[in-house]
Amino acid sequence: QTFQYSRGWTN
């Protein structure tokens, strides 16, 4: 998982 600014958690 990575955290993207103003988008939330994505795989």
From Swiss-Prot:
Belongs to the corazonin family. GO terms for biological process: neuropeptide signaling pathway. Keywords: Amidation, Neuropeptide, Pyrrolidone carboxylic acid, Secreted. GO terms for cellular component: extracellular region. The keyword Ligase does not apply. It comes from Delia radicum (Cabbage root fly). It is found in: Secreted. Cardioactive peptide. Corazonin is probably involved in the physiological regulation of the heart beat. The modification Pyrrolidone carboxylic acid is found at residue 1. This is Corazonin. In larvae, both corazonin and corazonin(3-11) are expressed in the CNS but not the midgut or thoracic perisympathetic organs (tPSO) and abdominal perisympathetic organs (aPSO). Corazonin is expressed in the ring gland (at protein level). In adults, corazonin is expressed in brain, cardiaca, corpora allata and thoracic-abdominal ganglion (at protein level). The lineage of its organism: Eukaryota, Metazoa, Ecdysozoa, Arthropoda, Hexapoda. The modification Asparagine amide is found at residue 11.
